[in-house]
Amino acid sequence: MPDVGIIYNDSKPRACTIAEELQQQLQDRGWGVRLATSQSGLLGYSNPDTVICHTPVESLVPRGFDASLRWAIVLGGDGTVLAAARQLAPIGVPMLTVNTGHLGFLAEAYLDSLPAAIEQLCKGEYSIEERTMMEVKVLRRELIRWEALSLNEMALHREPLTSMCHFEVAIGKHVPVDIAADGVIVSTPTGSTAYSLSSGGPVVTPDVPVFQLVPICPHSLASRALVFANREPMTIFPATPERLMMVVDGNAGCYVWPEDRVLIQRSRYPAQFIRLQPNEFFRVLREKLGWGLPHVAKPSAPDQS
């Protein structure tokens, strides 16, 4: 049998225990198992007083993992899934996401259904859903200073105790637009239910080939979220004298200076999710975020008597 992988959050004892148990179970079935933590997918934050260390996205693949793996099981919460997507997308390995955290918005399976999920996985009774990822680069002239893959979003915003920011945003060859706000978010359809949603952006179904630009606390009544085709690159030029903070998927980032620019484009590496049942996005929205729930009782009109 071909080899498979297990990626787990080693900061969670429960995930560590399950990873060891799964490794033994799969080996007993005749599978070769390669084990890795999600740590290499967590890029961390650059210190403003040190030189940024440019890490190519392909270098985040765990040691021993390659394109020959049939699939990988990811054990952890949504943060672990975001990290694992960066680790597995460059080698095209699909992942079964198993929630050991809290919300588990990106989870396909849960611990109570794990034995049945493994049985189905080993029999090959699953489908694969591709999710678009963004490639985010910080450039100074033509030099790449920092880059990362993003499954959810990139947020570029001011530091605490600094004033409002100004950005010049160019999409493809269109005329650039100016935005005055505390920051901007660029998200994928997958990320439309995360930070972007909290900032007033729309929910986008995962199969739509778009990105969205969402201003954070804009200083304009006319500044609204913009949805645009992901075939066009976006470049963000800081138009403010202070340095800015960039955060990718909530767990990686660096400082962006006035002389830098941020280039965002669709990655050639999609994240591949294993689906054990037909994916019903609206069901997930309803169960996880309470979207579209029926009103149990409507407020009554005031008594006019």
Curated annotation (Swiss-Prot):
Instruction: List the InterPro entries hit by this protein, alphabetically.
Output: ATP-NAD_kinase_N, ATP-NAD_kinase_PpnK-typ_C, NAD/diacylglycerol_kinase_sf, NADK
Give the residue spans that cross the bilayer: none
The coenzyme or cofactor needed here is: a divalent metal cation
Write one Gene Ontology MF term.
NAD+ kinase activity
Binding positions (NAD(+)): D78, G79, N152, E153, D182, T193, A194, Y195, S196, L197, S198, N251
Q: Which reaction does it catalyse?
A: NAD(+) + ATP = ADP + NADP(+) + H(+)
Compartment(s) where it occurs, according to its Swiss-Prot or TrEMBL record: Cytoplasm
Q: Among its keywords, does the record have rRNA processing?
A: no
Annotated S-S bridges: none
Coiled-coil regions listed in the entry: none
An annotated GO cellular component: cytoplasm
State the active site. D78
What is the stated purpose of this protein? Involved in the regulation of the intracellular balance of NAD and NADP, and is a key enzyme in the biosynthesis of NADP. Catalyzes specifically the phosphorylation on 2'-hydroxyl of the adenosine moiety of NAD to yield NADP.
Q: What is this protein called?
A: NAD kinase 2
Organism from which the protein derives: Synechococcus sp. (strain ATCC 27144 / PCC 6301 / SAUG 1402/1) (Anacystis nidulans)
